[in-house]
Amino acid sequence: MSNTPLPSSFDAHPEFFQETKWQKFTRRIKEEPLIPIGYAATSYALWRAYKSMKAGDSIELNRMFRARIYGHAFTLFAIVAGGIYYGQERRQRKEFEKALQQKQDQEKRDAWLKELEIRDKEDKDWRQRHAAIEMAAKEAEKKRG
């Protein structure tokens, strides 16, 4: 059986989505708050370096370039340390998300099959009505002719 998802009119249904991008973003910031701090420190150092360059203060400019490097190092350390610290939790979360995705795929497949059954029933009903109308027309034709 193919792993491609089955098409359905339920694709845009909101109950099939668990976590929005914004929710994921805020969750990741709460899990690893040092990374945004490192980003902020690096950005601040770059901003101060820009201001120093505009003012012509080469000593402050060099100091801010060093601060930018320290900010990058801090951010890199936070990423590596967070990866080590949250590694097991991330593996468990990926397993959970995989199981959740399988459940959602099964729900979508079931909904799609139900939708196909409904459409099939409607088609059969239409064919029966159409056959009955044809029979009535033939009987009326026989009575006339």
From Swiss-Prot:
Alphabetical keyword list: Coiled coil, Membrane, Mitochondrion, Transmembrane, Transmembrane helix
Domain HIG1: 6-97
Cellular localisation: Mitochondrion membrane
Stored InterPro entries: Hypoxia_induced_domain (IPR007667), RCF1 (IPR050355)
A Pfam family reported for this protein in Swiss-Prot or TrEMBL: HIG_1_N
GO biological process, one term: mitochondrial respirasome assembly
Membrane topology: Multi-pass membrane protein
Coiled coil: 86-144
GO annotations of cellular component type: mitochondrial membrane
Predominant localisation class: mitochondrion
Key word Coiled coil present: yes
Membrane-traversing stretches: 33-50, 69-86
Keyword Repeat: no
Subunit structure: Associates with the respiratory chain complex III/complex IV supercomplex.
Entry function: Cytochrome c oxidase subunit which plays a role in assembly of respiratory supercomplexes.
Protein family: Belongs to the RCF1 family.
Protein name: Respiratory supercomplex factor 1, mitochondrial
Organism: Ajellomyces capsulatus (strain G186AR / H82 / ATCC MYA-2454 / RMSCC 2432) (Darling's disease fungus)
